[in-house]
């Protein structure tokens, strides 16, 4: 049986994990967190992509959205603003789990609205970097 293929997709400013607002996002870099995920899921082919550019995130969704088994997507601030990302997720077959490191409902009111949730199979947030692990487990259980 072939390995399941899952993309971990991060949006704007998530390239600064480990440096940016550690009180909210923690001290771990995404490289460190991704290495931990690879160790935790040795039977899954995990890929990682990050962009600060909305169009590049859309292109990546289109690129893998008909061949991968799942996408773990932290759209960052685009979560609250991007109809285009919602539409890109709706346009593909691959299930997408929306992920947030922080509990967005304990933060600013504008973060309480997600424009992509309706296109995703589920949402996981508030568990720090462990939110990514939980999302992968959810995708594997589908």
Show which residues each predicted segment covers:
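Glycine- and acidic-residue-enriched helix-capping/strand-helix junction motifs
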Residues: 16-31
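Short Gly/Thr/Asp-enriched flexible loops that form oxyanion-binding sites at enzyme active sites
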Residues: 82-91
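Extreme N-terminal starter segment of soluble prokaryotic enzymes
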Residues: 2-6
């Amino acid at each position: 049986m072939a390995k399941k293929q899952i993309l971990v997709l991060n949006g704007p400013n998530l390239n600064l994990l480990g440096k940016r607002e550690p009180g909210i996002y923690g001290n771990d870099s995404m490289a460190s967190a991704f290495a931990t995920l690879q160790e935790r899921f040795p039977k899954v082919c995990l890929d990682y992509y990050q962009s600060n550019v909305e169009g590049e995130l859309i292109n990546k969704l289109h690129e893998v959205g008909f061949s991968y088994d799942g996408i773990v997507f932290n759209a960052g601030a685009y979560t609250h603003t991007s109809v285009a990302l919602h539409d890109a997720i709706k346009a593909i077959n691959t299930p997408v789990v929306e992920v947030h490191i922080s509990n967005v409902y304990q933060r600013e009111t504008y973060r309480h609205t997600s424009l992509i949730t309706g296109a995703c199979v589920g949402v996981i947030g508030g568990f720090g970097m462990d939110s990514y692990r939980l999302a992968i487990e959810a995708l594997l259980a589908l």
